[in-house]
């Protein structure tokens, strides 16, 4: 099992802990991952990180589809991959309707079709097997719709990039997890309950059965994110994770379409998820945080004293996952997990 480091996205001010990233690279972490929401983007920080590291791979978790055309994403991927010596990992996702329509100003329409077409076009650009043409529901290349000049012509990338840049898709929902298993090289999960791998495994196998090439859990990179907070005070360690879970379960999505909350329900915390969301949407943020049960935090994350984390890590190590992406701000956590992964 490989380890990745999640640095996510910045808040009000751009911030990257390069000491933490360099230490992760030194102790053997395979990859570092950025994200984007409606502030800092996922790509610019990776260019900065790539210029100051030498071996750690550089992943996006995720680049939002509505933020860029497929061609723009392919150009970015090829360029950053070339500049970093073949270290780029392309993670893509639709995001949710609140961000797609509220931030990017485009329709959240047929997201699975959108993702399939997007990945197909990106792969075609990377492959450079001929000038790009595509006829789909969302994309038509060259464009011939309303307002077209008729002057567009099929083009092939000038840049000869790496054809096999790995493509991941991010998803917490069953149908898009199946699609990921079918069309992508890996699946990015915001969180995962290690004892409930059965909740996602059938969808992965469904996708493998439809793939154009043989695929299995042995070759497909399931890459969940787990937070790690080391400390003797369990309540203090859990608190920032409860705040994050309350945000995702309660506020990352609309009341009737919240992919994170729906996953938490599926792994056995239905009543808790409903209460957290209700409190959060009512503006009772502190109460929503308090409603996150200790058992949920302990199931999804690595928290507490070193001995406790050592014991809990075994559950993750026993799973058929290729990469465990660690969210932490502690250098001691980076060192501990590197030791545990290699033992």
Where are these regions (language model features)?
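Active-site-adjacent structural elements that line small-molecule/cofactor binding pockets in enzymes
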Residues: 1-343
């Amino acid at each position: 099992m490989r380890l990745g480091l999640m640095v996510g996205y910045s808040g009000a001010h751009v911030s990257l802990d390069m000491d933490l990233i360099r230490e992760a690279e030194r102790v053997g972490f395979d990859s570092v991952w950025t994200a984007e929401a409606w502030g800092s983007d996922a790509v610019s920080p990776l260019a900065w990180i790539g210029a100051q590291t030498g071996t750690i791979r550089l992943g996006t978790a995720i680049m939002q589809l509505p933020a860029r055309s497929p061609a723009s994403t392919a150009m970015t991927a090829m360029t950053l991959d070339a500049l970093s010596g073949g270290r780029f990992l392309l993670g893509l996702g639709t995001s949710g309707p609140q961000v797609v329509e509220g931030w990017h100003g485009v329709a959240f329409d047929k997201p699975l079709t959108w993702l399939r077409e997007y990945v197909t076009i990106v792969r075609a650009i990377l492959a450079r097997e001929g000038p790009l043409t595509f006829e789909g529901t969302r994309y038509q290349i060259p464009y011939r719709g309303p307002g077209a000049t008729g002057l567009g012509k099929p083009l092939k990338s000038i840049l000869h990039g790496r054809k096999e840049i790995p493509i991941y898709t991010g998803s917490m929902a069953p149908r898009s997890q199946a699609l990921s298993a079918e069309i992508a090289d890996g699946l990015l999960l915001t969180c995962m309950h290690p004892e409930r791998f059965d909740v996602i495994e059938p969808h992965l196998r469904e996708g493998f059965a439809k793939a154009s090439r043989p695929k299995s859990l042995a070759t497909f990179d399931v890459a969940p994110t787990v937070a790690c907070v080391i400390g003797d005070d369990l309540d203090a360690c859990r608190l920032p994770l409860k705040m994050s879970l309350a945000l995702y379960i309660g506020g990352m999505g609309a009341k009737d379409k919240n992919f994170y909350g729906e996953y938490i329900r599926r792994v056995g915390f239905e009543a808790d998820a409903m209460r957290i969301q209700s409190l959060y949407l009512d503006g009772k943020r502190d109460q929503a945080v308090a409603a996150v049960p200790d058992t949920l935090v302990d199931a999804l994350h690595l928290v507490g004293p070193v001995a406790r984390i050592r014991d809990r890590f075994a559950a993750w190590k026993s799973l058929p996952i290729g990469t465990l992406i660690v969210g932490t701000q502690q250098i001691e956590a980076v060192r501990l997990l590197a030791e545990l992964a290699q033992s």
